[in-house]
């Protein structure tokens, strides 16, 4: 498994994990930055992540193209930044990423009541990909009894 390193400008402990005060203060390599902050601070966090060498980002909050002229400008700036810095971004405004294989379980989402996972290589494992968080949540709720291996919900702007 990987290591979780929360970032909080005030420091402290978050859900039992010791935090660092900035993205640049993370001492170990980072495979994925999960960004869950207010929309007007996201571009700075993406820049700081890129400066730190983090190329994969998951941005859960909205406040972009769906939020009127300010959000559209923010979305265009994010797309430009991603292209200039070679970033892979899922989001913004998405329900997250869920991988339920018991050998490599990962969930960066606000969705609850995740189903039990199944081994991704088994014939009874089901992978579901959705661009709609609402559809993914409905699928998770209604597909109880199915063994899932992955439920990612990227949203492309």
Predicted features along the sequence, with ranges:
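Catalytic-core regions of core metabolic enzymes
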Residues: 1-157
């Amino acid at each position: 498994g990987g290591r979780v390193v929360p970032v909080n400008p005030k420091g402290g402990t978050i859900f039992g994990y010791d935090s660092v005060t900035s993205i640049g203060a993370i001492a170990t390599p980072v495979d994925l930055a999960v960004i869950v902050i207010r929309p007007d601070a996201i571009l700075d966090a993406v820049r700081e992540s890129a400066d730190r060498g983090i190329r994969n980002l998951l941005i859960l909050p909205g406040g972009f193209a769906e939020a009127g002229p300010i959000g559209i400008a923010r979305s265009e700036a994010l797309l430009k930044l991603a292209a200039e810095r070679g970033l892979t971004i899922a989001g913004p405004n998405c329900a997250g990423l869920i991988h339920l294989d018991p050998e490599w379980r990962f969930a960066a989402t606000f969705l609850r009541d995740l189903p039990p996972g199944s081994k991704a290589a088994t014939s009874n494992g089901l992978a579901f990909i959705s661009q709609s968080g609402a559809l993914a949540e409905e699928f998770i709720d209604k597909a109880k009894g199915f063994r899932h291996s992955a439920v990612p919900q990227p949203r492309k702007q």
